[in-house]
C-alpha cells in the first residue's frame, strides 16, 4: 500500500519553476536562489534561472549546474556617476526581463519565483495562462536607502509605493527570518493582512563536504596561530571597519608574543562595476595603514569556494560585523565548518547563533568584539567545543533536507 502511494506520488507531474533574479553574482541572495533552484531540481521539478546579469567567472560554482539565461544586460545599472538611479534601473531591468521571458523566450512554466525586485510581478499577470508567483523577501528594499534630501524623497516615493503594491500581488510571500517578518509587517502598512511565512536559508553542505581544504601559505604569513576571518561584501553597511577596530583593541589586550601570532583575513565579494566596492576597499586599506596593522591583515577579493572553505577550516573564529542583518548565511557556513562566530547582537544572527554555545553575540563596538576574540586565544579548547555545537545546530535547524521539503510544499501548494 505504501509503495503504491509512493508510486502515485512520483507519477504526479512535477511543476515547472522559473526563477527570476536581478544579478546572479556572489551575495547571500544569490546563494539562496541557487540553493532553492537546486533543491527543487532535486525533487524532480523542471528549473530554469533567468537573470539580467550573469558572469560565469564571478558566480557560485553551482550556477554552472543549472540552466541560466540572461537578458537585458545592455540596460544601464545606474544613471551617471556614483550609482545614482540604481533603484529605477533595477526596476526597469527586471520588468524588461519579465517581458522578455513572457513574450520572447518561449518559456513554459507553472510557477515563477522572484526575489529582491517585486516590480516584475504585474508583468506575469499578462500571461495567457495564469502563472503562480512566489516572492521571497530578503528585506524591504525601501529600508535599504537613505532619504537625506527632498529630491531623494521625491525620487523614492513612487518606487516605494510600487514595491509595496506589487509585493502584495504575489500568491505566496516568504521571508528569510522572524526578524524580516516583523520588519515586513511594520513597513508595508497596506499589507497588514498578509502574514509572510519564514523559510530559513539552508546550507548546501554537499559543497562543503566534498572540498578538500588547501594550504593557506600564500594568504597567511608564517608563524600565525590565531587566524581571524571576516567574510562579507566590500560595502559600508557591512561594517567591516568594526573588525579592524576590534583588532586594534585586541593588540592592547594581548602579550606581544600572542599578538605576533594573530592575523585577520578580510575576505569579501568584490565587483569592479560597483563603485562602492572599489571605494570601500581603498578606505579599508587606508585604515589598516593608519592603524599600523599592515602585517596583521590580508585583504582577499572575490575568493573561490575552495578558498572560503579552506579559510573556515583553518580559522580560530569568524567575525560577523553587520548590524540588523536580515539573516546572514556566513554564520551557518562557519558553524557547519566547526568555526565559532562572533556576531553583532541584532537581526538574523539572533536566530542562527546560540550565544555562548556556538559563538558570541556582542554589542557592535570594538571593545566587546575584542573581548570575545580574546576568549579564544586564552582558552584554545573553546573553538573545538563551540565548533561541535555549531555543526550540530546547523544540521538540526538549517538542513538542506528541511529547506527542500518546505520549499517544495510551498510551490506545490500554489498549484492546488
Curated annotation (Swiss-Prot):
Residues 1-84, 106-416 are cytoplasmic. It is a single-pass membrane protein. It catalyses: a beta-D-Man-(1->4)-beta-D-GlcNAc-(1->4)-alpha-D-GlcNAc-diphospho-di-trans,poly-cis-dolichol + GDP-alpha-D-mannose = an alpha-D-Man-(1->3)-beta-D-Man-(1->4)-beta-D-GlcNAc-(1->4)-alpha-D-GlcNAc-diphospho-di-trans,poly-cis-dolichol + GDP + H(+); an alpha-D-Man-(1->3)-beta-D-Man-(1->4)-beta-D-GlcNAc-(1->4)-alpha-D-GlcNAc-diphospho-di-trans,poly-cis-dolichol + GDP-alpha-D-mannose = an alpha-D-Man-(1->3)-[alpha-D-Man-(1->6)]-beta-D-Man-(1->4)-beta-D-GlcNAc-(1->4)-alpha-D-GlcNAc-diphospho-di-trans,poly-cis-dolichol + GDP + H(+); a beta-D-Man-(1->4)-beta-D-GlcNAc-(1->4)-alpha-D-GlcNAc-diphospho-di-trans,poly-cis-dolichol + GDP-alpha-D-mannose = an alpha-D-Man-(1->6)-beta-D-Man-(1->4)-beta-D-GlcNAc-(1->4)-alpha-D-GlcNAc-diphospho-di-trans,poly-cis-dolichol + GDP + H(+); an alpha-D-Man-(1->6)-beta-D-Man-(1->4)-beta-D-GlcNAc-(1->4)-alpha-D-GlcNAc-diphospho-di-trans,poly-cis-dolichol + GDP-alpha-D-mannose = an alpha-D-Man-(1->3)-[alpha-D-Man-(1->6)]-beta-D-Man-(1->4)-beta-D-GlcNAc-(1->4)-alpha-D-GlcNAc-diphospho-di-trans,poly-cis-dolichol + GDP + H(+). It comes from the Eukaryota. Its EC number is 2.4.1.132, 2.4.1.257. It is an enzyme of class 2 (transferase). Keywords: Congenital disorder of glycosylation, Congenital myasthenic syndrome, Disease variant, Endoplasmic reticulum, Glycosyltransferase, Membrane, Transferase, Transmembrane, Transmembrane helix. Pathway: Protein modification; protein glycosylation. GO terms for cellular component: cytoplasmic side of endoplasmic reticulum membrane; endomembrane system; endoplasmic reticulum membrane; membrane. GO terms for biological process: dolichol-linked oligosaccharide biosynthetic process; protein glycosylation; protein N-linked glycosylation. InterPro entries: ALG2 (IPR027054), Glyco_trans_1 (IPR001296), Glyco_trans_4-like_N (IPR028098). One of its GO terms (molecular function) is GDP-Man:Man2GlcNAc2-PP-dolichol alpha-1,6-mannosyltransferase activity. It is found in: Endoplasmic reticulum membrane. Residues 85-105 dip into the membrane without crossing it. It is linked to Congenital disorder of glycosylation 1I: A form of congenital disorder of glycosylation, a multisystem disorder caused by a defect in glycoprotein biosynthesis and characterized by under-glycosylated serum glycoproteins. Congenital disorders of glycosylation result in a wide variety of clinical features, such as defects in the nervous system development, psychomotor retardation, dysmorphic features, hypotonia, coagulation disorders, and immunodeficiency. Myasthenic syndrome, congenital, 14: A form of congenital myasthenic syndrome, a group of disorders characterized by failure of neuromuscular transmission, including pre-synaptic, synaptic, and post-synaptic disorders that are not of autoimmune origin. Clinical features are easy fatigability and muscle weakness. CMS14 is an autosomal recessive form characterized by onset of limb-girdle muscle weakness in early childhood. The disorder is slowly progressive, and some patients may become wheelchair-bound. Mannosyltransferase that operates in the biosynthetic pathway of dolichol-linked oligosaccharides, the glycan precursors employed in protein asparagine (N)-glycosylation. The assembly of dolichol-linked oligosaccharides begins on the cytosolic side of the endoplasmic reticulum membrane and finishes in its lumen. The sequential addition of sugars to dolichol pyrophosphate produces dolichol-linked oligosaccharides containing fourteen sugars, including two GlcNAcs, nine mannoses and three glucoses. Belongs to the glycosyltransferase group 1 family. Glycosyltransferase 4 subfamily. This is Alpha-1,3/1,6-mannosyltransferase ALG2. It comes from Homo sapiens. The lineage of its organism: Eukaryota, Metazoa, Chordata, Craniata, Vertebrata. The gene is ALG2.
Amino acid at each position: 500500500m505504501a509503495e503504491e502511494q509512493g508510486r502515485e506520488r512520483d507519477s504526479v507531474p512535477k511543476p515547472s519553476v522559473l526563477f527570476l533574479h536581478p544579478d546572479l553574482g556572489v551575495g547571500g541572495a544569490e546563494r539562496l536562489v541557487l540553493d532553492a533552484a537546486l533543491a527543487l531540481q532535486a525533487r524532480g521539478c523542471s528549473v530554469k534561472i533567468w537573470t539580467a546579469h550573469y558572469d560565469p567567472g564571478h558566480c557560485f560554482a553551482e550556477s554552472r549546474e543549472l540552466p541560466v539565461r540572461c537578458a537585458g544586460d545592455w540596460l544601464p545599472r545606474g544613471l551617471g556617476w556614483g550609482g545614482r538611479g540604481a533603484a529605477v534601473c533595477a526596476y526597469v531591468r527586471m520588468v524588461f526581463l519579465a517581458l522578455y521571458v513572457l513574450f520572447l523566450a518561449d518559456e513554459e512554466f507553472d510557477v515563477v519565483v522572484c526575489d529582491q525586485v517585486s516590480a516584475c510581478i504585474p508583468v506575469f499577470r499578462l500571461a495567457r495562462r495564469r502563472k503562480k508567483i512566489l516572492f521571497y523577501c530578503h528585506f524591504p528594499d525601501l529600508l535599504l536607502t537613505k532619504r537625506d534630501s527632498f529630491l531623494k524623497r521625491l525620487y523614492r516615493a513612487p518606487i516605494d509605493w510600487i514595491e509595496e503594491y506589487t509585493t502584495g500581488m504575489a500568491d505566496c510571500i516568504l521571508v528569510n527570518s522572524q526578524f524580516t517578518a516583523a520588519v515586513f509587517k511594520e513597513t508595508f502598512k497596506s499589507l497588514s493582512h498578509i502574514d509572510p511565512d519564514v523559510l530559513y536559508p539552508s546550507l548546501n553542505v554537499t559543497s562543503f563536504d566534498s572540498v578538500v581544504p588547501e594550504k593557506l601559505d600564500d594568504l597567511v604569513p608564517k608563524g600565525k596561530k590565531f587566524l581571524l576571518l571576516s567574510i562579507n561584501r566590500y560595502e559600508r553597511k557591512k561594517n567591516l571597519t568594526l573588525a579592524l577596530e576590534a583588532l586594534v583593541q585586541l593588540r592592547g589586550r594581548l602579550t606581544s608574543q600572542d599578538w605576533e601570532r594573530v592575523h585577520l583575513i578580510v575576505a569579501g565579494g568584490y565587483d569592479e562595476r560597483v563603485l562602492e566596492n572599489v571605494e570601500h576597499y581603498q578606505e579599508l586599506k587606508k585604515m589598516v595603514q593608519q592603524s599600523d596593522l599592515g602585517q596583521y591583515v590580508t585583504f582577499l577579493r572575490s575568493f573561490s569556494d575552495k578558498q572560503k572553505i579552506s579559510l573556515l577550516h583553518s580559522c580560530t573564529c569568524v567575525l560577523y560585523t553587520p548590524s540588523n542583518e536580515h539573516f546572514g548565511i556566513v554564520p551557518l557556513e562557519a558553524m557547519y565548518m566547526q568555526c565559532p562566530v562572533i556576531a553583532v547582537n541584532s537581526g538574523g544572527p539572533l536566530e542562527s547563533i546560540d550565544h555562548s554555545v556556538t559563538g558570541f553575540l556582542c554589542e557592535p563596538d570594538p571593545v566587546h568584539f575584542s573581548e570575545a576574540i580574546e576568549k579564544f586565544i586564552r582558552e584554545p579548547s573553546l573553538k573545538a567545543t563551540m565548533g561541535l555545537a555549531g555543526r550540530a545546530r546547523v544540521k538540526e535547524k538549517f538542513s538542506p533536507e528541511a529547506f527542500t521539503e518546505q520549499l517544495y510544499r510551498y510551490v506545490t501548494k500554489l498549484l492546488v
